[in-house]
Amino acid sequence: MEFKHVLMILGVIILTLAPLIMYSGLGEDEGYFGGADGAAGDLIMEISPNYEPWFEPFWEPPSGEIESLLFALQAAIGALIIGYFFGYNKAKYDDQN
């Protein structure tokens, strides 16, 4: 295995482990992984207590796990689209050369 591949693998391992070491088990209770929506809503209510939202969501997931699943599914679909785009362009470039 070439040296640059070893460096790349070590870089991936470091990038994977760094957040786990930095937060060392602290989670949502301490606010590390709180969503921006909740923080923004709290700030709006603090600034203007009489504010009324324009609309309500037509469906809310029944649990946080389902919400996380939908978010992960959305990220996976986006990654597939981006991967397809890069693969398509790479194959097109290789065919031209």
UniProtKB/Swiss-Prot annotation:
Gene Ontology biological-process annotations: cobalamin biosynthetic process
InterPro entries the record matches: CbiN
Transmembrane segments annotated in the record for this chain: 6-26, 68-88
Compartments where found: Cell membrane
CC terms in the record's Gene Ontology section: plasma membrane
Coiled-coil zones: none
Protein name in the entry: Cobalt transport protein CbiN
Organism: Methanococcus maripaludis (strain C7 / ATCC BAA-1331)
Gene for this chain: cbiN
